[in-house]
Regions:
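Short, solvent-exposed loop/turn segments at the edges of secondary structure
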Residues: 5, 13, 63, 123-125, ...
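Mid-domain, small-residue-enriched loop/turn segments at the edges of structured enzyme/sensor domains
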Residues: 20-80
Length: 179
């Protein structure tokens, strides 16, 4: 498979096998960590391949909502990628199927979203997205929810609620454009 095909499988279907193959071609987990360090992200790190990276192990394979939004801003809205590559990346995120019950679910008709949902095996669900409200600059949002006593459906409900709050803030003009 080509890099483009692997990337599309990862973005649209969260294909872990494609993620492993693409990560191997890019220098493995340490290559990904080196890449985000080059973006100025001192928090995000990759230590293991899927599916082991989804098993909680302290500081291994981690990021934060602020760190992922900062890196995503540079990749999706900055000059890290060529315009055509940025457009393909965002189109793949827009086509993402696994995020349908998270932030995407909360957005009004006419808002464009490209997202990347994730979760670990037992207790954490997350989603980050580029959101394009009508007549506004694009915005980035990231939600991480960790609750060992809640199943995936319950965690997704919390992420949807966070998405609803985000929409209200945007509609009220309380979210500043920082692009």
């Amino acid at each position: 498979m080509s890099v483009g095909d692997l990337t599309q499988a990862i973005l649209e279907y969260s294909d872990n096998t494609a993620a492993i193959l693409l990560m191997r071609s890019a220098g493995g987990p340490s290559g990904l960590t080196k890449f985000v360090r080059g973006l100025g992200d001192a928090v995000t790190r990759s230590d293991r391949y899927e599916p082991k990276s989804n098993q909680y192990r302290g500081a291994l394979d981690t990021t934060s909502p602020r760190a992922i939004v900062g890196s995503a801003h540079k990749i999706l809205l900055g000059a890290v990628l060529k315009p055509a590559s940025r457009a393909r990346l965002e189109a793949g995120m827009v086509a993402c199927k696994p995020g349908a019950r998270r932030i995407r679910f909360s957005l009004p008709e006419g808002w464009l979203i490209g997202d990347r949902p994730g979760e670990n095996i037992t207790e954490e669900s997350n989603d980050y997205a580029i959101v394009r409200p009508p007549s506004r600059a694009p915005l980035l949002i990231s939600t991480y929810y960790d609750a060992s006593n809640t199943n995936t459906a319950g965690r997704e409900a919390v992420i949807r609620e966070a998405g609803s709050v985000f929409v209200k803030w945007v509609q009220l003009g309380e979210v500043a454009d920082r692009s």
